[in-house]
């Protein structure tokens, strides 16, 4: 069991003029009579396939505003799904109006550094998702070149599974798989270069793509947030173990240390963990954009 636990997802807030479509781990989706989607980022936070029972104040706004920052920065590489930021007052700062997309059925992950599930796989076979890597790398090592490591898309409560490129081809076809691979690496390397100028290492990140009604491939979902990326402080980076980060790793580390059994619903988070998590999200926004949140 995982996801929202026995209580199920929280009730979606009622928003005049919008009809609720579905609730994800973090986002609530609505539609209107113009066939637009209202994408609302909540303050929910997930880890190890569970949605925590405690929210992180301001997190949804950070995710939305940081995504908008990156969407603007990367627009020359690929258009995105944003239609408008003129959203209802009830969800100000944490929602965007977007085009409906037919999403590709893979997660598009790029890695420039070895950590997380990539590190675990490398220890077993010196490769990550079919990308052969040199011997002697450590947890946190920079890779010789950026690699594409796709994953399957999982339902709420299920776990994404890393796959190789050939498996991605079987799911979405050779042409689309190559297109998404090229886009993913280009977006990652452009974003990583920008982040480096801010003293931040973008270790890895996940993108999602879809086609609009005209068949155009667009960047959807979110872009380069602490939920979809690993951000490390360049000044403290040292391969050989866990890196100080501006993302969910802090929460993951706490949960592991707490002794929580991942087969049971997670506990309420202590105030200290909530406050420190909120500060990490705000710090990520500031370090990347140069603006206080």
List the predicted regions and their residue ranges.
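A long amphipathic alpha-helix within ATP-dependent nucleotide-binding catalytic cores
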Residues: 172-203
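Conserved beta-strand/loop block within the catalytic cores
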Residues: 26-30, 206, 214-216
């Amino acid at each position: 069991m995982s996801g929202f636990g026995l209580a199920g997802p929280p009730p979606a807030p009622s928003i005049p003029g919008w009809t609720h479509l579905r609730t994800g781990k973090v986002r609530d989706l609505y539609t209107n009579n113009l066939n637009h989607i209202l994408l609302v980022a909540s303050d929910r936070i997930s880890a190890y396939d569970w949605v925590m029972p405690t929210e992180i104040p301001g997190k949804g706004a950070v995710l939305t505003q940081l995504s908008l920052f990156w969407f603007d920065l990367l627009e020359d590489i690929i258009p995105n799904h944003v239609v408008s930021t003129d959203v209802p007052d009830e969800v100000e700062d944490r929602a965007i109006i977007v085009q409906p997309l037919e999403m590709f059925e893979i997660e598009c992950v790029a890695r420039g550094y070895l950590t997380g599930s990539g590190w675990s796989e490398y220890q077993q076979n010196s490769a990550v998702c079919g990308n052969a890597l040199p011997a002697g790398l450590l947890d946190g090592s920079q890779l010789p070149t950026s690699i594409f490591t796709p994953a399957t898309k999982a339902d709420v409560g299920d776990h994404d599974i890393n796959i190789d490129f050939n498996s991605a081809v079987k799911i979405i076809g050779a042409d689309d798989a190559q297109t998404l691979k090229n886009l993913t690496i280009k977006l990652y390397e452009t974003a990583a270069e920008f982040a480096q100028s801010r003293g931040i290492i973008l270790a890895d990140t996940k993108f999602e793509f879809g086609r609009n009604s005209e068949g155009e491939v667009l960047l959807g979902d979110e872009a380069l947030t602490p939920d979809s990326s690993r951000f490390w402080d360049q000044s403290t980076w040292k391969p050989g173990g866990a890196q100080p980060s501006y993302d969910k790793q802090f929460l993951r580390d706490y949960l592991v240390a707490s002794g929580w059994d991942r087969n049971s619903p997670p506990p309420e988070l202590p105030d200290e963990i909530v406050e420190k998590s909120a500060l990490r999200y705000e710090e990520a926004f500031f370090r990347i954009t140069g603006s206080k949140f």
